[in-house]
Amino acid sequence: MTVLYQNRQIRELERLAVESGISEYELMCRAGEAAFKALLARWPEAQEITVCCGKGNNGGDGLVLARLAYENGLKVTVYLAGQRHQLKGAAAQAANACEASNLPILPFPEPLLFKGEVIVDALLGSGLSGEVKAPYDHLIAAINQAGQYVLALDVPSGINVDSGEVQGTAVKANLTVTFIAPKRGLYTDKAPAYCGELIVDRLGLSESFFRAVFTDTRLLEWKGVFPLLPKRARDAHKGSYGHVLVIGGDYGMGGAVRMAAEAAARVGAGLVTVATRPEHVPIVSGPRPELMCHQVAAADDLKPLLTAATVVVIGPGLGKSDWAKSLLNKVLETDLPKVLDADSLNLLAESPSQREDWILTPHPGEASRLLGISCNEVQRDRFQAINDLQEKYQGVLVLKGVGTLIKDESQAYYVCPAGNPGMATGGMGDILSGIIGGLVAQRLSLASAAQAGVFIHSMAADRAAEEGGERGLLATDLFPHLRVLVNP
């Protein structure tokens, strides 16, 4: 799997490169050249650009790009947020090279005027600490309102590369070229929407540099997920692939358990049983007779079902009634592996406990209740939030949202880059819990089931969106794609 880095680790990679004999200015020239090549590839018809530079090394990257564009015949306007004498080190060398090529470096005019087809954002980069301050907030707002294409160098100015947080305001780019290594914050929360297309350029650094710097964050990819899926034996039978028990579906919410149960079956569980309100039995087993369905009036009705189960999924449509609480308590008395979703998480927040045999799958709102903080605090640093969740509750945690995160007892973080806005619809979480439960039933570890389940779920949604569009995408549209994805 692709590894993702924090800002401090990128700085360590830069230090190792300089110690090996690659100067800071050489790295800057490589960055500017990589970004210029990306600009030409994305906008080959562009004749004129405006390059917006800050006073640090990100501004220096922009100056290198500006010079290369100018020397290759483009019309180039370079603006500097600050005074020329404030540029130091490699950035000053980049400015000297611009001036040697007769490319002037200008102060930002009032009113702001951006010329050409493309604006290059080289204002702040990854060195920002705290919220964006003047004059950069004003400049970022102007770039976002200009209407031209935007290329961001390393990171859209205003984005925290470790967490993905928008630090007050941020540039909305069409294309971001990030340097040396992928930064973990660019794949979660609001950052993907601000990056646009994301390209990673290693600037020619050898693999030995990357082996020398440890990182605990991985990007989920098909080549890493596919080996987690067990091969099927020729002499297999339904008992070989486990028995999922899905519990939930309080009054008016029978569809939730129905979707979770079918999702478990679609990813290959051998048997799937639903335990729900008596009124919901017909809507579960009628249209999908492969699902066994039992009416549960009281917690004791679960005893024989739990005895037969391999894994329990509890929460879809569960509600928070006394009935729901009694069912959850009965499940927690067992040593079966468990997937908790939806209202089972809200009930858990009222009586927190720790276990190693569960997977918790909160969205940000549920995570806020589990941690006793605001939803904004969860989203401000999703990596910290999932770390706190795992420490408080143990087991495996899945923090849903853009760039879903997974964390287990190994302390590794996994980030899912797949998924799309069409998933913002009812039932998607029910499908995910069923997928994960179905994979646990097939003897995947809890951590592997969470990783594979999240990725397959998001990939199925992407395939469904490609087929019919994001708007109007239904959770059940994922079913045919699930079957294809688990049979690569």
UniProtKB/Swiss-Prot annotation:
Record region (ADP-dependent (S)-NAD(P)H-hydrate dehydratase): 221-488
A molecular function (GO) term: metal ion binding
Cofactor notes: Binds 1 potassium ion per subunit.
Chain sites annotated for binding (6S)-NADPHX 2: G317, D430
Catalytic reaction equation(s): (6S)-NADHX + ADP = AMP + phosphate + NADH + H(+); (6S)-NADPHX + ADP = AMP + phosphate + NADPH + H(+); (6R)-NADHX = (6S)-NADHX; (6R)-NADPHX = (6S)-NADPHX
EC id: 4.2.1.136, 5.1.99.6
All copies of domain YjeF N-terminal, residue ranges: 10-211
UniProt signal peptide: none
Residues bound to ADP: 400-404, 420-429
Annotated region (NADPHX 1), positions in chain: 57-61, 125-131
Sequence positions that bind (6S)-NADPHX 1: Y136, D154
Pfam families in the cross-refs: Carb_kinase, YjeF_N
NADPHX 2, as annotated region: 363-369
Top-level taxonomic group: Bacteria
Residues in coiled coil: none
Protein family (similarity comment): In the N-terminal section; belongs to the NnrE/AIBP family. In the C-terminal section; belongs to the NnrD/CARKD family.
UniProt function note: Bifunctional enzyme that catalyzes the epimerization of the S- and R-forms of NAD(P)HX and the dehydration of the S-form of NAD(P)HX at the expense of ADP, which is converted to AMP. This allows the repair of both epimers of NAD(P)HX, a damaged form of NAD(P)H that is a result of enzymatic or heat-dependent hydration.
This protein's name: Bifunctional NAD(P)H-hydrate repair enzyme Nnr
Organism: Coxiella burnetii (strain RSA 493 / Nine Mile phase I)
